[in-house]
């Protein structure tokens, strides 16, 4: 999947389609901030894509 940068996401799989990661700011576990897609790199996403395919 490829959620645009800045859009809310739940995990990296949703953002890695366009080499972004799902970035969760500190405090996101408390529900104050939402995780959103942020710029990552191909190496990061290639590793994640293997996991995402299995999911």
UniProtKB/Swiss-Prot annotation:
One GO CC annotation: extracellular region
Primary localization class, coarse: secreted
Role this protein plays: Antagonist of L-type calcium channels (Cav1/CACNA1). In vivo, causes paralysis in posterior limbs, and gradual decrease in movement and aggression during 24 hours after intracerebroventricular injection in mice at dose levels of 3 ug per mouse.
Similarity annotation: Belongs to the neurotoxin 09 (Tx3-6) family.
Molecular-function GO terms, alphabetical: calcium channel regulator activity; toxin activity
Location in or out of the cell: Secreted
Alphabetic keyword roster: Calcium channel impairing toxin, Disulfide bond, Ion channel impairing toxin, Knottin, Neurotoxin, Secreted, Toxin, Voltage-gated calcium channel impairing toxin
Domain of life, per lineage: Eukaryota
Tissue and organ expression note: Expressed by the venom gland.
SS bond list: 2-16, 9-22, 15-37, 24-35, 45-52
Notes concerning its domains: The presence of a 'disulfide through disulfide knot' structurally defines this protein as a knottin.
Keyword check for ATP-binding: no
This protein's name: Omega-ctenitoxin-Pr2a
Keyword Disulfide bond attributed: yes
């Amino acid at each position: 999947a490829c959620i645009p940068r800045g859009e809310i996401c739940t995990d990296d799989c949703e953002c890695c389609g366009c080499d972004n990661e799902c970035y969760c700011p500190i405090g996101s576990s408390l529900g104050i901030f939402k995780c959103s897609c942020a710029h990552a790199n191909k190496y990061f996403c290639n590793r994640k894509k293997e996991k995402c395919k299995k999911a």
